[in-house]
């Protein structure tokens, strides 16, 4: 029904031969039957998957897909490192806000006799092993259990905040926390979100610029907030010459995402010294 309403918004389709289906409806197309299941907000309001029992095939709409350009058709043919990264990139930049819906949908998927999952875009998952792998991976990503790994994202004007970022990384690694350092100038916000898949902590740094944070950092954190990451720890730091608001702004932005902020923000006037 929602899909039909959307079509009416785009097209003059009242005279088209459209059959509206809902969860549990079955369509016979000769040798095969298509059983429909609504999966609202995964990741569109009108999302629906289709199951063909004769082929043990789930046509999964956007779920289990990837934005990947390849000449291969099946997931098991592709380099697995690149494939797993593509799965994380797609999930953490598109599906992440709908993780509760994912967790509700997975038991429905697991109740079906499936030998192949064909998403709307990306590689096809074939065979029991491949199907189990992607379903388990989706559950892990949707649960967002904290991981003992951190990411430090930063912008810098005259390298003072950059020096602080390197010091934060060194301190974390000295206590055994693997850390990824990412400049928002060098890494697109979608790359930063993909890395967040592996990290339980986000530490953000920016110099003060016009009494607030740098524009690229503001853009990155606004994008991150919209994707609603859960179960993360946050931290903030920054350098300044005069007013020094950036670290406080970062702290408040991370806290507004629901991140646990166990320590106060850290700010440095002018340039950091080793003794600091």
Which positions does each model-derived feature cover?
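Short internal beta-strands
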Residues: 1-3
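Short hydrophobic segments within beta-strands
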Residues: 60, 120, 153-155, 182, ...
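Short, charged N-terminal beta->alpha structural module
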Residues: 153-175
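Active-site-proximal loop/helix segment associated with metal-binding centers of metalloenzymes
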Residues: 43, 63-96, 140-145
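FMN-binding flavodoxin-like domain, especially the glycine-rich phosphate-binding loop
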Residues: 70, 80-117, 122-124, 167-180, ...
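Catalytic core of the metallo-beta-lactamase
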Residues: 11-77
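Conserved beta-strand elements of the Class I
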Residues: 51, 58, 149-153, 235
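Terminal amphipathic helices with adjacent charged low-complexity linkers/tails
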Residues: 122-149
């Amino acid at each position: 029904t929602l899909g039909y309403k959307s079509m009416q918004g785009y097209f003059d389709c009242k005279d088209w031969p459209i059959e509206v289906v809902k969860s549990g409806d079955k369509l016979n197309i000769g040798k095969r039957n298509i059983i429909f299941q609504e999966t609202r907000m995964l990741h569109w309001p009108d999302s629906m998957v289709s199951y063909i029992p004769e082929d043990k095939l789930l046509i999964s709409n956007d779920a289990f897909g990837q934005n990947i350009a390849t000449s291969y058709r099946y997931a098991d043919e592709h380099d697995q490192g690149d494939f797993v990264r593509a799965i994380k990139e797609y999930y953490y930049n598109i599906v992440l806000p709908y993780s509760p819906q994912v967790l509700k949908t997975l038991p429905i998927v697991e109740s079906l006799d499936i030998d192949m999952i064909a998403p709307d875009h990306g590689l096809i998952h074939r065979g029991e092993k491949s199907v189990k792998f992607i379903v388990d991976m989706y559950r892990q990503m949707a649960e967002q259990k904290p991981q003992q790994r951190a990411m430090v994202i930063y912008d810098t004007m005259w390298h003072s905040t950059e020096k602080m970022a390197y010091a934060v990384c060194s301190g974390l690694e000295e206590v055994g926390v693997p850390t990824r350092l990412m400049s928002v100038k060098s890494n697109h916000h979608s790359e930063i979100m993909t890395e967040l898949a592996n990290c339980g902590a986000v530490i953000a740094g920016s110099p003060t610029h016009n009494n607030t944070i740098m524009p690229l950092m503001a853009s990155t954190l606004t994008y991150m907030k919209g994707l609603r990451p859960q179960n993360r720890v946050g931290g903030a730091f920054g350098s300044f010459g005069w007013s020094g608001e950036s670290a406080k702004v970062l702290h408040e932005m991370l806290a507004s995402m629901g991140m646990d902020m166990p320590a106060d923000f850290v700010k440095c006037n002018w340039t950091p010294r080793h003794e600091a």
